[in-house]
Regions:
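Gly/Trp-centered helix-boundary motif
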Residues: 1-110, 114, 118
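Alpha-helical transmembrane segments of integral membrane proteins
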Residues: 2, 80-192
């Protein structure tokens, strides 16, 4: 239950997170670089108020870049990076891309793997033997090599990553589907 709640929260933040503030994914302001996290409402409690402890040769020093640069109306919920880009927006934009790749690869993997495994298990005999030998060869090629070669040959991007995952990750699903088909095909309710 906790895992499902966490996944739902991540999906909701990936969808709505970048729109929760005024910053864009690629927008940058070099005058606001390396700001610590600052969240409206929590700053009154001394939590996420934009201050940070810095170690110096004489000890530690508490600084607040928002006050030093007179940016009291600026809020970076996760802080800003060395180019002055909002980390909150960039985090959830990245999560959005990762979720799209994961869902697409899982769906394609399930369709190819289940189809291959069910066909192999259903027909059995020579068809099953040939399909399983091909599966063993495909499983013997290291996945990292295939992914790296595809990224070198094709233009790097989301489609290439989905294609690489699709080519390499269907083997496990195929074996599971084949085993289930072989188990079910000999059951009495099927033979009747």
């Amino acid at each position: 239950v906790l895992g499902l709640i966490l996944i739902v929260v991540i999906v909701l933040l990936a969808v709505f997170g970048p729109g929760m503030n005024s910053y864009t994914y690629s927008g940058q302001d070099l005058s606001q670089k390396n700001f610590a996290p600052r969240v409206p409402g929590l700053e009154q409690f001394g939590i996420l108020d934009g201050s940070e402890k810095m170690s110096t040769t004489t000890g530690t020093k508490v600084t607040n870049a928002y006050q030093e640069k007179d940016k009291l109306d600026v809020y970076y919920w996760f802080g800003s990076d060395l180019y002055g880009r909002d980390i909150w927006t960039r985090t959830w934009e990245g999560a959005r891309v990762s979720l799209i790749i994961a869902v697409a690869a899982a769906v394609i993997d399930m369709v190819i793997g289940m189809s291959y495994g069910l066909i192999s298990g259903y027909f059995g005999g020579r068809v099953d033997m040939i399909m399983q030998r091909f599966l063993e060869v495909a499983n013997g090629i290291p996945r990292l090599v295939i992914v790296t070669l595809l990224l070198l040959v094709l233009q790097p991007g989301m489609v290439t990553i989905i294609f690489a995952l699709m080519l390499t990750e269907w083997v496990g699903m195929s074996r599971i589907a084949r085993a289930e088909m072989l188990k079910l095909k000999d059951q009495e309710f099927v033979l009747a």
